[in-house]
């Protein structure tokens, strides 16, 4: 599913260097669930996302819910957080441009390539993704409050330092302190553009994203995304 900062295109490369086989796999920043949906062979999979509406949406999809078409009027109402949590989550992500939380209504649009029904595309992708999320446990809390079993493989895709476009500011310094503590009893991997000296770079990938390392959002920006291990 399209989601701002999604790892859909990078999941295969990242999983090549993380041995998840037989491990408890935990994602504190699961977002659009594209990464965890690609994880195979883990003992268990747990997805945490602080946005409760997104979590409610995925829980509903995994349970067999088929989202309805969202009109502009629906979108405006749901944007005010009036409605069922899972429907708000669907409108906020799947019915918004580039998967940005209520970043503009996406419906049927005339493009240079022809007519595109963005909601239909999102629905088809979501139903396929829901099949790959069977067996995943979900939670919605701050990463610091997440209970992580000892020995887990923890993959973190936090909001990147110096980027814009996310709903709230993110304290990257506090996050890295938490990651260092967590690495005492787990294998911790972090996707970022840069990291403190105590993290080891193990993968470097050129990407194009709507969030660039120079802090500018919007459009397509070329960046080098890295994977670090603690």
What does each model-found stretch correspond to?
Residues 41-139, 144-145:
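Class I S-adenosyl-L-methionine-dependent methyltransferase module
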Residues 1-50, 121, 135-156, 160-230:
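Class I S-adenosyl-L-methionine
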């Amino acid at each position: 599913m399209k989601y701002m900062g999604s790892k859909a295109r990078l999941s295969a490369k990242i999983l090549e260097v993380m041995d998840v086989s037989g491990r408890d796999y935990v994602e504190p920043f699961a977002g659009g669930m594209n990464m965890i949906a690609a994880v195979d062979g883990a003992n268990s999979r747990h997805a945490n996302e602080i946005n409760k509406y997104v979590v409610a949406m995925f829980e509903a999809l995994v349970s067999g819910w088929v989202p309805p078409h969202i009109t502009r009027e629906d979108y405006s109402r749901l944007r005010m957080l009036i409605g069922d949590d899972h429907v708000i989550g669907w409108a906020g992500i799947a019915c918004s441009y580039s998967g940005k939380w209520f970043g503009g209504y996406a419906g049927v649009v005339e493009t240079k390539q022809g007519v595109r029904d963005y909601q239909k595309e999102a629905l088809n992708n979501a139903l396929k993704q829901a099949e790959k999320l069977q067996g995943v446990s979900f939670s919605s809390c701050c990463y610091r409050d997440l209970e992580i079993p000892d020995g887990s493989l923890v993959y973190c895709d936090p909001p990147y330092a110096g980027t814009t476009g996310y709903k709230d500011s993110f304290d990257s310094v506090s996050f890295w302190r938490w990651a260092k503590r967590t690495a005492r009893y787990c294998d911790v991997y972090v996707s970022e553009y840069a990291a403190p000296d105590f993290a080891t770079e193990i993968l470097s990938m050129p990407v194009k994203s709507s969030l660039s390392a120079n802090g500018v959002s919007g459009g397509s920006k070329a960046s080098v995304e890295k994977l670090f291990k603690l």
